[in-house]
Amino acid sequence: MLKKDMNIADYDPELFNAIQNETLRQEEHIELIASENYTSPRVMQAQGSQLTNKYAEGYPGKRYYGGCEYVDVVETLAIERAKQLFGATYANVQPHSGSQANSAVYMALLKPGDTVLGMNLAHGGHLTHGSPVNFSGRLYNIIPYGIDESGKIDYDEMERLAVEHKPKMMIGGFSAYSGIVDWARMREIADKIGAYLFVDMAHVAGLIAAGVYPNPVPHAHVVTSTTHKTLAGPRGGIILSAADDEELYKKLNSAVFPGGQGGPLMHVIAGKAVAFKEALEPEFKAYQQQVVKNAKAMVEVFLERGYKIVSGGTDNHLMLVDLIGRDLTGKEADAALGSANITVNKNSVPNDPRSPFVTSGVRIGTPAITRRGFKEAEAKELTGWICDILDDAHNPAVIERVKGQVLALCARFPVYG
């Protein structure tokens, strides 16, 4: 018999302690992983609701099970809000993740062996854009494009490769690129060779929703995103389009269900609906503007302290610190900063001589620190501490000093105040 007062603390203290420790870690550590963020209590409330009990294979109004009248309302709210947020005429909110959304696009538009032009992972792309260890690199013929000497996307090279190899699909989007992407130029190239343009905007979706980064939806045939990262929603994915092509929309829906997934996670879709509503509020735009201001402030300090930033700056929420030529690997930098309660991730940089498990760079992003209230002053102060550690990464005294400063700053800016 189920009772409302059942709880994890009494029943499963081992699990409860792990959850409590993670909660404390998030409060006492500064989160700089560019793909991480803090979702709102409203989103978590939706995810912890009775919607988790309901199977709902199919789409609103076309379910395979009965009893779906209320989950239809939930999913329709999420769909309509996503369309409003990004100016789309089609939205699928069922993908469990960004990678599964991307997989559905491949399935809908391509056949195994088709040629795809995607951004090189070592130049800032994503695993699902053609990495040989991913389904995309195993099932399709991938032609990688990259960045030039200045760290910017080389559109002339992209066009040359497109004309030479005639891919059926071109992919825009990134996981570690700090510049503005010219979606219109990419569509011109795609149209020149008769290819689909597919954009994965996962990293910058929140910035796009707020109007502080160019929107790819008017230019691409299909756009995907995660719903966490800069969007600050639950972990999941979405597929969008403004192509006004009903046949394309049917293919995309079929590729998600039944092509790649079974029942949707209705409690997560409810969380997405909440997050989309939050992203439509005026304060969300102010938040995203501050995300970019904080990133630019951090870059300023890194450059002043003599550190190289790939592309020389940032126009979004992230930056890639290039440690090539320094007696410090990305892995060592990651570990040293982690010991001071600063969480980053090691990351390959262009022309990296080290393996992806070691790397010569670290990726840093500002969505999470901005979410807890940091502004430029705190971002600059924090970057100074990071540089202190990178300058002397094997000095325990420096790490302990910075850790104390981090704890004091975290206490001033609680995640959930």
From Swiss-Prot:
Site note Plays an important role in substrate specificity, residues: H228
Enzyme Commission number(s): 2.1.2.1
Gene3D superfamilies for this protein: Aspartate Aminotransferase, domain 1 (3.90.1150.10), Type I PLP-dependent aspartate aminotransferase-like (Major domain) (3.40.640.10)
One GO cellular component term: cytosol
Gene it is expressed from: glyA
Alphabetical keyword list: Amino-acid biosynthesis, Cytoplasm, One-carbon metabolism, Pyridoxal phosphate, Transferase
BP-aspect Gene Ontology terms: glycine biosynthetic process from serine; tetrahydrofolate interconversion
Catalyzed chemical reaction(s): (6R)-5,10-methylene-5,6,7,8-tetrahydrofolate + glycine + H2O = (6S)-5,6,7,8-tetrahydrofolate + L-serine
Enzyme class: transferase
Name of the protein described by the UniProt record: Serine hydroxymethyltransferase
UniProt organism field: Shewanella sp. (strain ANA-3)
Compartments in which it is found: Cytoplasm
Family designation: Belongs to the SHMT family.
Subunit structure: Homodimer.
Residue positions where N6-(pyridoxal phosphate)lysine is found in the record: K229
Superkingdom, natural source: Bacteria
Pathway recorded for this protein: One-carbon metabolism; tetrahydrofolate interconversion; Amino-acid biosynthesis; glycine biosynthesis; glycine from L-serine: step 1/1
